[in-house]
Amino acid sequence: MADEGEVSALVCDNGSGMVKAGFAGDDAPRAVFPSIVGRPRHTGVMVGMGQKDSYVGDEAQSKRGILTLRYPIEHGIVTNWDDMEKIWHHTFFNELRVAPEEHPVLLTEAPLNPKANREKMTQIMFETFNVPAMYVAIQAVLSLYASGRTTGIVLDSGDGVTHTVPIYEGYALPHAILRLDLAGRDLTDYLMKILMERGYSFTTTAEREIVRDIKEKLCYVALDFEQEMATALSSSALEKTYELPDGQMITIGNERFRCPEVLFNPNMIGMEAVGIHDTTFNSIMKCDVDIRKDLYNNIVLSGGTTMFPGIADRMSKEITALAPSAMKIKVVAPPERKYSVWIGGSILASLSTFQQMWIAKSEYDESGPSIVHRKCF
């Protein structure tokens, strides 16, 4: 691979909510679009309209009023491979406009994913898209690359899955990786539910997208939940309005911080799990006592669900309460954290030392899909 330097690798971060794709060496992804495949709910009556039987990404999003939207990736695991293939096809041919058989491809996945998921990804890349080489990297590890560190604990929370990955001197510590199947999509669902209590009904897959937008624009994390609830009760200072696509205005008050509070208290949605602060703490406690100090000092946030205002301060406060009293706690929230997994992938795929790590097509042909477990972390 290394001798033909002009062929740049493709980096594709397939999130549960958004696909981020582009070329290795770039500082930002060229294509960012929702991981959605939409199918018409109604039959076409006008001949010659060029109706398609499925739409992907932004096109599905813009026609969502007449479509049923499906996300093929749930909780970081691909649940519908036909739709996933459509998304990759759209990524390569429509968004990046490249021939995948000419470029090595770096894909990402959540840690503690089923092995079969990774094998199937490998198989589709080599057999359907005929890529010359590929690699599957762990998302959180890439985020740490992007932040310029080699040691730290990454709390990566996207649309489908949240995980904490402690990394020391470049090595991920697999025994201490924890995963929480609670992320942005669950928050959107919870916001849909609590908005219903206010009398606003959102039910279809298209309306869920509106609620996701409300969440992204208006929600924030309270530093002190009880106190914030009291403030919201006594005054309307925290109320904000949002204009729906049809021009109707809705008012949202304590829902603004009740929604992301679920991250710190999953019991609110009936999940028997501990919050992201406890998960991070537990992950650190599973590591060797000698390296904990370095981890406490480098808690790196990554992923779209860490974009809520106030999340870093709250995280810092909660971890400080759990950690030994004299411990120095530092929570790092890089401004580009929405894309830091992709940026890390771009850095990794363009390193000269990485070029011998690719799984080549010849190796795949010899060993089959299981090669991915031997060559990728």
From Swiss-Prot:
Subcellular location: Cytoplasm, Cytoskeleton
Cellular component aspect of the GO annotation: inner dynein arm
MF GO annotations: ATP binding; hydrolase activity
Protein EC: 3.6.4.-
Source domain of life: Eukaryota
Matches recorded under InterPro entries: Actin, Actin/actin-like_CS, Actin_CS, ATPase_NBD
Broad class of enzyme this protein falls into: hydrolase
UniProt keywords, alphabetically: ATP-binding, Cytoplasm, Cytoskeleton, Hydrolase, Nucleotide-binding
Annotated SUPFAM superfamilies: Actin-like ATPase domain
Pfam family name, one: Actin
Keyword Transport: no
Record's keyword annotation contains Nucleotide-binding: yes
Record's catalysed reaction(s): ATP + H2O = ADP + phosphate + H(+)
Family: Belongs to the actin family.
Annotated function: Actins are highly conserved proteins that are involved in various types of cell motility and are ubiquitously expressed in all eukaryotic cells.
Name of protein: Actin
Species annotation: Chlamydomonas reinhardtii (Chlamydomonas smithii)
